[in-house]
């Protein structure tokens, strides 16, 4: 029957649009889900003790069922499954309804580091977040979560079948395959640096492979080196700070300094 395509050109109104349009699929960046997590958590923390206790119990049940079992391709114990169904129809469905996500199907997210804390929350409330990784030079998708295979928090999924991934020097992720660019147009000098001797493309991202899943740690060029020689990965620090409701934007500063600091833009709309 096809699908209805909805385009929102006002980022600050996205949550209002969701409650109005009730999307079943939506592509987004991790920052969107960080905002959702912050808003829901703040509302529940301000609720009465009984409501708060019920909410966090529901989250614990959702986490155990959806992450410890479903994400690992394991069947939940009968008692857990029955408890989840009750919790899902009562507490978790109310949370999703407040978000406008009564019938969540698939919600791809990519473009930045996804905090495991946020990813855990999204799966716990019953939303199928599919984390992926891609580049302009890779015709978008390099890897993504597969519903029929184990999914680990913090990973960017498994490489798609036509892509070869290897880890090079400085733990750089290197790619090769039919969807990877053959080179930049009329940029011979750049192309000589962009590919290794075996034809693998240098992504500039650091990471590692574990049990078939790809994990990213940092953009190599973004790594800071403090004055005492220690390397700092700013994105991981920033993702931890961005789950605070009082912070809108943050930039970690550490290069050639004795300490790590951060430039913070407060959330003035509270």
Task: Map each language-model feature to its residues.
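ATP-dependent adenylate-forming carboxylate-activation enzymes
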Residues: 4-21, 27, 46-50, 232-237
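C-terminal boundary motif of the adenylate-forming
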Residues: 206, 244-268
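Residue-level signal for inorganic ion chemistry
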Residues: 26, 165, 212-213, 241, ...
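A short helix-loop-beta submotif of the ANL/AMP-binding
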Residues: 1-6, 126-128
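Gly/Ser/Thr-rich phosphate-binding loop
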Residues: 24-27, 39-151, 164, 248
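Conserved ATP-binding/catalytic segment of the ANL
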Residues: 159-226
